[in-house]
Amino acid sequence: MRILQLSDTHNQHTRLTELPEADVVVHCGDFTENGTEEEVLDFLNWFAGLPYPHKLFVTGNHDLCLWDAEGIEDLPDGMHFLQDRGCVIDGVRFFGLAYNHPESLIPDGVDVLLTHEPPVMLLDKSAGTHWGNAPLRRRVLEVKPRYHLFGHVHEAWGVMKMEDVVFSNGALADNCNRLCRQPRLFAL
């Protein structure tokens, strides 16, 4: 299974025109800039039109109008809003934790975890400060998903492996919210 990671596109998603082939595309939040309903609808229409059989997304700190949403009605087949919930695709267990929600919601047995926030001290440093979430780090290292995909801290874009977990900060934007990086592709 090939998984394409997007994150932190801040209303610039339509500029992503040459995306690689994948089985699943995930967006780790901050698909909007101001979190308005209009911005969310624009993103959802674009995301639904991508040529991938499975599309998964979680909210980020900019996606304000969806922070408390429990779901989104009438999503196309294969598109999942993983707001504190999971789905299974070809035997692979995905789970998405909404921005700033408690890490205790992450169940055991997850293969691919999507969050917006990074775990503390792992691809989370900006301007000399670590912005990650310490309880999230503890829970991720308990659950040990094969992949933990996130964004949020634009300057900390990168991949690292720790205790058999691949951590990926897939933020595509720079500090001025301009797209400056290519999406990352993983093979599972």
What kind of region is each of these model predictions?
Residues 19, 40-44, 168:
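Short amphipathic alpha-helical segment that frequently serves as the phosphate-/nucleotide-binding helix
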Residues 10, 28-41, 152, 156:
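Di-metal (Zn2+ and/or Mg2+/Mn2+) metal-binding site signature of metallo-dependent hydrolases
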Residues 26, 114, 149:
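N-terminal Rossmann-like NAD(P) cofactor-binding module of classical short-chain dehydrogenase/reductase
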Residues 19-20, 107:
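A short, aliphatic-rich alpha-helical micro-motif
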Residues 10-14, 32-36, 45-49, 56-135, ...:
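Conserved catalytic scaffold of divalent metal-dependent phosphoesterases
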Residues 86-90, 138-143, 147, 154-188:
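Binuclear metal-dependent phosphoesterase catalytic core
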Residues 1-4:
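Extreme N-terminal starter segment of soluble prokaryotic enzymes
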Residues 23, 30, 53, 111, ...:
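Conserved acidic residues
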